[in-house]
Amino acid sequence: MRKQFLIAHRGYSTIAPENTHLAFAAAQLFGFDGLWMEVQLTKDKQIVVTNLDNYKVGNKTHKLSDINLVNLKKINLAKQFKVNVQEQTILTLKEVLMEFLTPFRFLLLFIKGEEEQQNQVLVEQLAQLLEGFELAKEKLILLSSHFSTIKYLNEKLKSFKTSFVFNSKKQLVHLTKDEITQNCRFLAPNDSFYHKNCAELQSYGLPIILWVIKGLLRYQFYENDRFVKFQIAAQLY
């Protein structure tokens, strides 16, 4: 039995195209405790699961925010994968929640947008969507690398678990420790930043979500860290 929760980064993405149904189903089959996925808004305000900012539609590349869901659904996400697998289309968050919220212990949703206003629209859409999922408060962790988005999440989705995502001191320098502990249930530093600054980050007293772990030795090293509760990885350990 694992000491911590092992979360599949964009699904089991070493053996399947990331952020696809195939990757999520593989993570379930092989026994990951949960999924990490990025969520963004389409032009027609649908929440989709993707880490990509741009997609090629026809002969032109467009921003995701300029493409409607119906056109995104025409794109085969498995086309560039390292091995030949069945066609995969982009998933809406609703589709993911309907199939994968129940079987996994946790789903980690990273709000990827860089624009504050766009993130607020996404949070509002998310609040409406989650009203229909009884297990959402228990199983979801909502993450952002923008502290204003964290605050807005807490305003619109009270009692949901939130986490601040960061990889440098620059992201922390303008925030007080009290601000962070009052607004976040977790801290989510990347592996290398946490490795260099673990004592400082542990002083916040918040459990750690650590991303992205690469290699068995690194995974085993953090197994004995009492602050680390989640390890995010694309590989099964």
Curated annotation (Swiss-Prot):
GO MF annotations, alphabetized: phosphoric diester hydrolase activity
Pfam families: GDPD
Membrane-spanning residues: none
Stored PROSITE patterns: GP_PDE
Gene Ontology biological process terms, A to Z: lipid metabolic process
Start and end residues of each GP-PDE domain: 4-237
Family: To glycerophosphoryl diester phosphodiesterases (EC 3.1.4.46). To M.genitalium MG293.
Name by which UniProt lists this protein: Uncharacterized protein MG385 homolog
UniProt organism field: Mycoplasma pneumoniae (strain ATCC 29342 / M129 / Subtype 1)
